[in-house]
Amino acid sequence: MGQNGQRVFLGKVFFRGKIILKTGMHIGGSQESMQIGGVDSPIIRDSGNNLPYIPGSSLKGKLRSTLEKFGKRIKEGKEEKLSSNRSIGTFRQKVFIHCCEDIQLALNCEVCRIFGATGDDREFQKGKKDRRGDKAGNFPALLMVRDSLLDDAFMHPSRLLTEVKTETGVDRSTMAANPRQVERLLPDTAFIFEMVYSVENITLAGKAKTNFPEANLKTDLDNILTCMEIIESEGIGGHTSRGYGKVSFVFTEFSGRSLDYFKGKTEKEKEKSDGGFSIQEAREKIDEIVKLLQKEPENAVSD
């Protein structure tokens, strides 16, 4: 973080498991070529092996937008709800998200602390003559979300993975039909998900403190799991209002690994993991993971 402070690495928390489709899912891809009788709206596929996958950007974006609905931040000592204050769209198609204006706000924001924020220099300098020319700075995300790849059990050449669903829009005035074809993944298809949360002691200025960020860690892990539960009731991908994209998350691992683990000083068996458990069961492991990671960061690595 340079002149804005210091980030001291303490460990990682791993979220691993399966995303199981309960209904057909559509995450749109691009049409590389026009074909007579081709699908109007194909799904996204890996260009190397032509297998479908769930992009990390799609899952992370859904997690972030979900947390923006109930997350909060501390500003000037007061708790406040979040506003959609940053446009990430185009001039013609505006898309607004929440994004804190500077590092100080991002550190105290439940959304930006997990998913990151790009500083807004104009807002940061507004009304501060002595800060003219200062940069707000970026706050890198603590959570990394990988692409969810197809489960090996579904990779048999004869296995049918998708269907083409024909949908019809009807003009309310003329009653003319407008059919379209949508490709979607079949129910019960499974993908392997992995997310990694970086546990860091973040100090904005001066020497890094040795205080373990227990409160923020518990809040962040709980918020991530809460978002996953909400996604189970809402869905992932397009057309969720028409029944697409209902999913279930099944954990195979929810574990914490300290810096000592990466240095080879602790046994692998000390990680907190299990197989085939629900989000609620994962939530019960939060305190156990925090205790595993909670130690004096004497040998921590800072940037």
PLM regions and their residue ranges:
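RNA-binding basic/glycine-rich loop and surface signature characteristic of RAMP-family CRISPR effectors
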Residues: 1-166, 170, 174-303
